[in-house]
Amino acid sequence: MDKKINPKKVEMFNSLKEFLDGKDNIFFLDYRGLTVAELTKLRSRVEDEKGALKVVKNNIMKRVLKDKDIEGLDSYLLGPTAVVTAFDEANVIAKIFYEFVKTTTLKVKGGFVLGEVYDELKLSAYSKLPTKIESISLFMSVLKAPMSKLVRTLKALSDIKV
């Protein structure tokens, strides 16, 4: 007996596959208990940071991940699941989740960041990393400090009258 494939599910599969194409950072959230307004606000904040949020069916998501040869994420696909992808700085998107966790019922399940599976604990630590701009700024201040000290020392020496 041949099992007919529901065209709606095929469409969902293709849509989700396209949603994940070219994305190195995928996060899984449990949105149970969030109001529509809270979920809309979360989606808006994620989009502001060049990310995207989509509520998914777990079985279809499992098939898409299998199709993309991504393993180790099945444990995050239980219960209501929202998938978030990050186009640029994934840790900025993760920070948004943890801001929402403080004030709502949102739960972070885990993720897939640059080819590695991250559990909730790892994602929490990842969310605390500085952004690319903050890292560059910190690096520049480290480089600038010795030069500033040298300039002040030379200035002090030139101010001393012999």
Swiss-Prot record:
The keyword Nucleotide-binding does not apply. GO terms for cellular component: large ribosomal subunit. One of its GO terms (biological process) is translation. It comes from the Bacteria. GO terms for molecular function: large ribosomal subunit rRNA binding; structural constituent of ribosome. The keyword Ribonucleoprotein applies. Keywords: Ribonucleoprotein, Ribosomal protein, RNA-binding, rRNA-binding. Coiled coil: none annotated. InterPro entries: Ribosomal_uL10, Ribosomal_uL10-like_sf, Ribosomal_uL10_bac, Ribosomal_uL10_bac_type, Ribosomal_uL10_CS_bac. Pfam families: Ribosomal_L10. HAMAP family: Ribosomal_uL10. Belongs to the universal ribosomal protein uL10 family. Part of the ribosomal stalk of the 50S ribosomal subunit. The N-terminus interacts with L11 and the large rRNA to form the base of the stalk. The C-terminus forms an elongated spine to which L12 dimers bind in a sequential fashion forming a multimeric L10(L12)X complex. Forms part of the ribosomal stalk, playing a central role in the interaction of the ribosome with GTP-bound translation factors. PANTHER family: 39S RIBOSOMAL PROTEIN L10, MITOCHONDRIAL (PTHR11560). This is Large ribosomal subunit protein uL10. It comes from Borrelia duttonii (strain Ly). The lineage of its organism: Bacteria, Pseudomonadati, Spirochaetota, Spirochaetia, Spirochaetales.
